[in-house]
Amino acid sequence: MKLLYLVPSVNQAGGVAKVLATKTDYFIQNFGYEVHIMTQNKGYETPFFEFNAQIVWHDIERKGHFLSAIYAYKKQLQTIISQVQPDSIIVADNGLKGYLVPFLIGKNSPVIFECHGSKYVNERPFTFSFLSR
């Protein structure tokens, strides 16, 4: 099975990078999966955590502002998908482009949205009383 992970970057300490390193290593070691990771690591900067050497990396550039950036992201994403031909695409990016992936790629592969967060984030209550009931 071929997996394509879409993540913003893995060159900083954080939960997404650590979970991704652990999960992808498990998939490769125990199931023999072929794992590809697409990042925006600014030219293949060294990942913060150690990743399995069998992972195939795809680094893309951020180009333009908002609409032009989304269009450039779509073109680069489609190129990588056509090269890799993944069985599943896992999106671990909770930014706007992460939510847009299913619309950007069409129906070629199943898309799984994986979100990592912390229960220790300070949440503010709604300021409108009718919304906080």
Regions found by a protein language model. Name each.
Residues 3, 88, 104-121:
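Active-site proximal beta-strand in glycosyltransferases
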Residues 14-22:
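A conserved mid-protein helix/loop that constitutes part of the nucleotide-sugar donor-binding site
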Residues 71-73, 110, 117-133:
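Nucleotide-sugar donor phosphate/pyrophosphate-binding loop at the beta->alpha transition
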Residues 91-97, 115:
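Short His-centered aromatic/hydrophobic patch
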